[in-house]
Amino acid sequence: MSHAICAPACALFDLPDVHVLAVERGARQFTVVVETVPPLVGCPSCAVLATGHGRRKVLLHDLPCAGVPVRVRWRKRIYRCLEDACEISTFSELHELAAPRGKLTTRAIAWAVAQLRS
């Protein structure tokens, strides 16, 4: 996927491999729907090249925009290991957007820490 269509919205994240698919304006918040560029991924257990196995929606809290809360709905990839002898059958994508099982984006955490230090 190219940034040609989503370039202005993608620039807000400042992450080159995150694409903004939609921005939804609710009554009290913005929801930004994103997904990442699919890299080649090896199984974390056996290092065999994994294949895509669908997506899971992960809701993250991000920085507010113009005083309005922002949520990020990340269409996180699920991968499947093709090695029969491997003890891991599926695993999820890791990305700098958020920590594993995190509820905040990494930039929201950095902003909050900076606010506490100032």
Give the residues covered by each predicted segment:
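Extended Gly/Ser/Thr-rich low-complexity repeat segments
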Residues: 38, 42-48
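Short, flexible, mixed-charge glycine/proline-rich loop motifs
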Residues: 30-40, 69-76
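Short, positively charged, Gly/Tyr-enriched micro-motifs
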Residues: 47-50, 59-118
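Intrinsically disordered, low-complexity segments enriched in polar/charged residues with Gly/Pro
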Residues: 7-10, 30, 58-59, 65-68
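Cys/His-rich Zn2+-binding cysteine-cluster or related metal-binding knuckle/ribbon modules and their
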Residues: 36, 40, 53, 57-60
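Short, conserved catalytic/metal-binding motifs centered on acidic residues
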Residues: 32, 43, 81
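Solvent-exposed beta-strand/loop surfaces of large extracellular or lumenal domains
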Residues: 12, 17, 52-58
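Long C-terminal interaction/binding lobes of large macromolecular proteins
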Residues: 1-31, 36
